[in-house]
């Protein structure tokens, strides 16, 4: 249906959103405000091609958009008014940059004549997010000129490209508007401009040309083939095609006959049948110092970001092997500053052929790793299987075995990601793990999880109480949310991760400034937001609630644990799983 343009702001916003629609934008998160009126109206008129999602709190909205972009592997736009509204995007902008997620940040602004003169709700929004965007600019003010409409169209197209290449990340457009902001006449005559503006001709040829670089297959470096003591580290990763990613690593592993040390946040552990040399208990194995010395490699291939494990990092730093990092981004992924070469490709682009498994050809070094994995895995499984008390580390181990196939799972920062690394059991459930490990903060946990779950398969979030409390405004999204999210709340009334640090021995000030108990009744909190709540009393009870998952709504399954008991359990057990494993 043709739109009757009442003013230049309306036409400008139409060109802006129509260009995005033709590029393939599917979601726009809209925060309420006056200065952004032209954009909000234009996005609303693009329904159903672009779904406009209204979210009150800008910080929550930005993390919701981040989750949507993670789940879809596509850019998501987020709109706010002028003033401090955009500043609330900042934590999500940082995470988007650090975890390489495409976000289009649209901050409406007052015109130049209303800046630096104490006009209301006006701050300096140019380069508001510092160096974090892939690209940023301020658009020109809307004017009645065909050349400027072409400038607007091409700037949007360029923004779309810069969000996705060469490395995905956020782009910030600061967009000034003069009054009137609503679609009402402004006294200007647009008739002459509109006689020259023919949408089908103007927008012809707009397509999403962003694609992965067309690399030819890269042969395996000869020195890899010569090494008999090499390991592959499959780090933190959220690949668009997880099965192909896992197959590529399996081919490399079988070609080289090297073990794959797979982080719990890597899809490798959820496609375990693809890789016969998968090592999931490396953090526990390396706590045995004698065994760790025998396992020291002379070469390491790191795929993607480094795993969370401090034990692994310390071990590599101590032995200083020759290292290669495989990742298509332009980022430095070596926080250890070792003898490292970066290959700026995807692991799928390595030209290696898998070989049939031949047990007689397995090297002594590879066999040492596989034997250690088998023994430690048995110790872990037997210990956790017999555990009846609600000790939080068992949650990750149990989830790895009982979630419905291909469930999207968001893993909160702090202790949940560590328990996943320690205890996530290799499986073939194809669970789609998501996380915010760019900057590793707890902010935006609930909102990101809701973004991941929106219009997707029923999803699960595992989080501690502080991470959830830090983002309770995310519950305000409930009326806009389409889908289901189950929140597994590990409520230990405080910051359990700090119990593992040396400061835990100092009381005071530990409990007041690090433990930080909030003493929240989560049943009452959920009632406030009209969210379902259930207190879990046993592991069997939890298992009954997780398979199958509901189709709609948000619910909280609360497990009350004791963080001091949990911390003592880790101190007593983590180093013991491989204590007698001298092979």
UniProtKB/Swiss-Prot annotation:
List the HAMAP family: MenD
Keyword vocabulary terms for this entry: Magnesium, Manganese, Metal-binding, Thiamine pyrophosphate, Transferase
Any one GO MF annotation of this record: 2-succinyl-5-enolpyruvyl-6-hydroxy-3-cyclohexene-1-carboxylic-acid synthase activity
User: What EC number(s) has UniProt assigned to this enzyme?
Assistant: 2.2.1.9
Q: Which Gene3D superfamilies match?
A: 3.40.50.970, TPP-binding domain (3.40.50.1220)
The Swiss-Prot or TrEMBL record describes its family as follows: Belongs to the TPP enzyme family. MenD subfamily.
Full protein name: 2-succinyl-5-enolpyruvyl-6-hydroxy-3-cyclohexene-1-carboxylate synthase
Q: Quaternary state and partners of this protein?
A: Homodimer.
Q: How is the cofactor bound?
A: Binds 1 thiamine pyrophosphate per subunit.
Cite the annotated pathway. Answer: Quinol/quinone metabolism; 1,4-dihydroxy-2-naphthoate biosynthesis; 1,4-dihydroxy-2-naphthoate from chorismate: step 2/7; Cofactor biosynthesis; phylloquinone biosynthesis
Asked if the record carries the keyword Hydrolase, the reply is no
Q: Which gene encodes it?
A: menD
User: Does this UniProt record's set of keywords contain Ribonucleoprotein?
Assistant: no
User: What's this chain's function?
Assistant: Catalyzes the thiamine diphosphate-dependent decarboxylation of 2-oxoglutarate and the subsequent addition of the resulting succinic semialdehyde-thiamine pyrophosphate anion to isochorismate to yield 2-succinyl-5-enolpyruvyl-6-hydroxy-3-cyclohexene-1-carboxylate (SEPHCHC).
Concerning PANTHER family, the annotation shows: 2-SUCCINYL-5-ENOLPYRUVYL-6-HYDROXY-3-CYCLOHEXENE-1-CARBOXYLATE SYNTHASE (PTHR42916), PROTEIN PHYLLO, CHLOROPLASTIC (PTHR42916:SF1)
- What reaction(s) does this enzyme catalyze? isochorismate + 2-oxoglutarate + H(+) = 5-enolpyruvoyl-6-hydroxy-2-succinyl-cyclohex-3-ene-1-carboxylate + CO2
């Amino acid at each position: 249906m043709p739109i009757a343009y009442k003013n230049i702001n309306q036409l400008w916003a139409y060109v802006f959103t129509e260009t995005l629609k033709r590029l393939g934008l599917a979601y726009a998160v809209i925060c309420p405000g006056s200065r952004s009126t032209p954009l909000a109206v234009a996005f609303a008129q693009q329904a159903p091609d672009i779904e406009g999602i209204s979210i009150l709190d800008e910080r929550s909205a930005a993390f919701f958009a981040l989750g949507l972009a993670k789940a879809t592997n596509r850019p998501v736009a987020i709109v706010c008014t002028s003033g401090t509204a955009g500043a609330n995007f900042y934590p999500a902008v940082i995470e988007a940059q650090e975890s390489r997620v495409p976000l289009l940040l649209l901050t409406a602004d007052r015109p130049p004549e209303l800046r630096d003169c104490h006009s209301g709700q006006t701050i300096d929004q140019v380069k508001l997010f510092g160096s974090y965007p892939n690209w940023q600019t301020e658009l020109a003010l809307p004017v009645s000129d065909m050349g400027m409409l072409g400038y607007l169209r091409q700037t949007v197209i360029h923004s779309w490209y810069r969000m996705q290449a060469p490395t995905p990340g956020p782009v910030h457009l600061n967009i000034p508007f003069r009054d009137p902001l609503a679609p009402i006449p402004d006294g200007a005559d647009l008739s002459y401009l509109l006689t020259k503006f023919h949408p089908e001709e103007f927008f012809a040829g707009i397509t999403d040309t962003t694609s992965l670089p067309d690399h030819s297959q890269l042969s395996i470096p000869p020195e890899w083939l010569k090494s008999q003591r090499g390991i592959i580290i499959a780090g933190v990763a959220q690949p668009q095609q997880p099965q192909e990613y896992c197959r590529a690593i399996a081919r490399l592993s079988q070609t080289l006959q090297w073990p794959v040390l797979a982080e719990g946040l890597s899809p490798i552990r959820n496609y375990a049948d693809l890789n016969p040399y998968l090592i999931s208990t490396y953090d526990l194995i390396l706590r045995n110092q004698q065994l760790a010395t025998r396992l020291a490699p002379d070469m390491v291939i790191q795929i993607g970001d480094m795993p969370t494990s401090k034990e692994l990092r310390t071990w590599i730093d101590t032995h200083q092997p020759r290292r290669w990092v495989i990742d298509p981004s332009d980022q430095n992924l070596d926080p250890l500053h070792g003898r490292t070469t970066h290959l700026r490709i995807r692991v799928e682009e390595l030209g290696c052929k898998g070989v049939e498994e031949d047990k007689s050809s397995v090297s002594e070094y590879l066999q040492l790793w596989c034997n250690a994995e088998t023994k430690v895995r048995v110790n872990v499984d037997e210990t956790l299987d017999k555990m009846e008390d609600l000790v939080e580390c068992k949650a990750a181990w149990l989830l790895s075995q009982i979630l419905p196939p291909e469930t999207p799972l968001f893993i909160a920062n702090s202790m949940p990601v560590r328990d996943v690394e320690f205890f996530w059991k290799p499986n073939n459930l194809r669970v789609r793990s998501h996380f915010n490990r760019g900057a590793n903060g707890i902010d935006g946990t609930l909102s990101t999880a809701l973004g991941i779950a929106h219009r997707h398969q029923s999803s699960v979030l595992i989080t501690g109480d502080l991470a959830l409390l830090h983002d309770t405004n995310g519950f305000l999204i409930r009326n806009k949310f389409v889908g289901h999210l189950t929140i597994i709340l590990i409520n230990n009334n405080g910051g359990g991760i700090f119990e593992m640090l040396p400061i835990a021995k100092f009381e005071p000030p530990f409990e007041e400034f690090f433990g930080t108990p909030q003493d929240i009744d989560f049943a009452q909190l959920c009632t406030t937001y009209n969210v379902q709540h259930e207190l879990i009393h046993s592991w069997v009870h939890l298992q009954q609630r997780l398979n199958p998952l509901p189709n709609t709504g948000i619910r909280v399954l609360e497990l009350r644990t004791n963080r001091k008991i949990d911390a003592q359990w880790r101190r007593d057990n983590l180093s013991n799983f491989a204590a007698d494993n001298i092979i």
